[in-house]
């Protein structure tokens, strides 16, 4: 009877945690969309647009390289482009479609330049034919060049055309002789005249209204579930890429000024200090408190990334530092592991090794019901190392220490599953799937101590879920962090 009561209590706690995770994922997504909208609103009011590029590293352009004969490299304060003879293309990254109707001026700031022929290449959608326009020549010396895209002679699919009003792809095509070099520091799309912003419109009012040619609509998105909210935002941008998207009820205002203190780095330094203290804890604490402190220290980088510390559309030095801290600390604990901890191994008894596959079986059922495409072996191979790192950190490093420190198996399973789910924030649907699978995998691992069956099951389930992800579906993608907030349109 007591065992039944404990199981019922654990089930209630699991349901409460799942509800809390859903609320958290939705709240983080709402905050991210609000920040995007506030920044876009402030840009339009300041006679700028949301499409600006700071170019310093190869990663600042599409594919981190030049398309064609040449290469890009990091300069001191600009992106250096070296020509190998012929025309090359530089792709400007678009986190959302660009509105050339509202921002038809292209500004290029060059710190080193030569009078080389320049063309602009645009695709309305990624599947649409390319539209090309000759834009004259770059300046002979360092300067800021402004190009009125609407005044250029455009050709789309080899036929004369007017300027595309939206861009899902935007490239610069520059022809230069071998040995020529330029340095491009910044690029931006700018409005030709001050832009009027509407008062916030409800979703239904915006859908019923005719597109306003001379103003930028500010639209409230009513959805609450994260994937649905992002799908509405993308639908808004497909109709009007210039539109400002805000969660319902959020009044537009300029975002707060960036902090003058490097708070992200201060938090990361405190995280590293806690890890150091936890590493030295066994010298000053008894086993159980030391194990608990080590588990909490290993969890901290995952929690910081989940809540947006050091995360961005392109992973930067902060997120890389947190990931390195987590993996380095996990490796350190493993190499100098307390012999009193319960041992783990890669393989266990084969008769029980199939049990971790149950979440993958459920994922295969979902795939059969709503497959978008067939999963490929290469997808599984790419996912496998990431699955191994996650499960090693959650199960081998954290769960075993929590289990030994708390001596409460149900609490350990719930904590490990929650950590696994938080690592997938703010993707609400993926957080809930990870929590459910994490409960099963943590329970099985703590009973059997074998890691490889869980890793394989995780990689298989992730590969199948990737094959059903859809920008407009309940599972938008397997992306996490700020990358989840990227445009699907």
Where do the model's predicted regions map?
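Aromatic-anchored segments of alpha-helical transmembrane domains
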Residues: 298-308, 360-369, 417-425, 459-469
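Membrane-interfacial loop-to-transmembrane alpha-helix junctions, especially the N-terminal start
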Residues: 283-299, 348-354, 409, 450-451
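Function-critical hydrophobic alpha-helical transmembrane segments in multi-pass membrane proteins
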Residues: 326-332, 352-422
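Beta-rich carbohydrate-recognition modules and glycan-binding surfaces
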Residues: 2-260
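Central hydrophobic cores of alpha-helical transmembrane segments
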Residues: 290-301, 412-419, 438, 452-463
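Alpha-helical transmembrane segments in multi-pass membrane proteins
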Residues: 256-271, 279-334
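Alpha-helical transmembrane segments
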Residues: 9-18, 239-241, 267-272, 290-304, ...
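Functionally important transmembrane alpha-helices
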Residues: 429-489
């Amino acid at each position: 009877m007591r065992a039944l009561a404990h199981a019922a209590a654990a089930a209630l706690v699991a349901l409460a945690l799942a509800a809390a995770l859903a609320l958290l994922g939705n709240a983080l997504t709402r905050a991210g969309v609000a920040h995007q909208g506030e920044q876009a609103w402030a840009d339009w009011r300041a006679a700028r647009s949301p499409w600006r590029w700071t170019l310093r590293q190869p990663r600042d352009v599409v594919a981190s390289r030049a398309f064609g004969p040449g290469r890009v490299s990091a300069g001191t304060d600009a992106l250096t482009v070296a020509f190998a003879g012929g025309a090359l293309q530089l792709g400007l990254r678009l986190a959302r479609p660009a509105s050339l109707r509202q921002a038809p001026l292209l500004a290029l700031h060059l710190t080193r330049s030569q009078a080389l022929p320049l063309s602009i290449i645009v695709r309305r959608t990624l599947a649409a034919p390319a539209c090309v326009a000759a834009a004259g020549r770059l300046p002979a010396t360092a300067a800021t060049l402004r190009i009125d895209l609407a005044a250029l002679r455009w050709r789309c699919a080899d036929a004369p055309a007017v300027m595309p009003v939206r861009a899902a792809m935007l490239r610069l095509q520059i022809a230069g002789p071998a040995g020529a070099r330029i340095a491009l520091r910044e690029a931006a799309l700018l409005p030709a005249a001050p832009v009027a912003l509407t008062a916030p419109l409800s979703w239904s009012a915006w859908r019923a209204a005719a597109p306003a040619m001379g103003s930028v609509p500010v639209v409230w998105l009513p959805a609450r579930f994260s994937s649905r909210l992002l799908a509405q935002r993308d639908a808004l941008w497909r109709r009007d890429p210039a539109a400002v998207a805000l969660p319902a009820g959020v009044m537009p205002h300029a975002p707060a000024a960036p902090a003058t203190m490097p708070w992200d780095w201060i938090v990361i330094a405190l995280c590293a200090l806690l890890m150091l203290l936890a590493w030295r804890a066994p010298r000053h604490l008894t086993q159980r408190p030391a194990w608990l402190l080590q588990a909490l220290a290993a969890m901290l980088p995952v929690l910081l990334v989940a809540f947006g510390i050091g995360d961005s559309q392109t992973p930067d030095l902060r997120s890389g530092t947190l990931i390195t801290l987590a993996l380095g600390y996990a490796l350190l604990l493993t190499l100098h592991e307390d012999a009193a901890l319960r041992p783990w191994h890669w393989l266990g008894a084969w008769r029980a090794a199939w049990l971790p596959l149950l979440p993958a079986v459920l994922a295969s059922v979902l795939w059969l019901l709503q497959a978008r495409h067939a999963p490929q072996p290469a997808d599984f191979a790419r996912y496998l190392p990431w699955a191994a790192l996650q499960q090693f950190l959650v199960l081998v490093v954290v769960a075993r220490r929590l289990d030994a420190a708390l001596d409460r198996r149900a609490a350990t399973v719930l904590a490990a599953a929650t950590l696994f789910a938080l690592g997938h924030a703010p993707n609400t649907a993926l957080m809930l799937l990870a929590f459910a699978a994490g409960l099963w995998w943590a329970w099985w691992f703590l009973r059997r101590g074998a890691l490889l069956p869980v890793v394989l099951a995780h990689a298989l389930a992730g590969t199948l879920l990737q094959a059903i992800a859809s920008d407009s579906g309940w599972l938008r993608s397997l992306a996490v962090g700020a990358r989840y907030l990227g445009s699907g349109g």
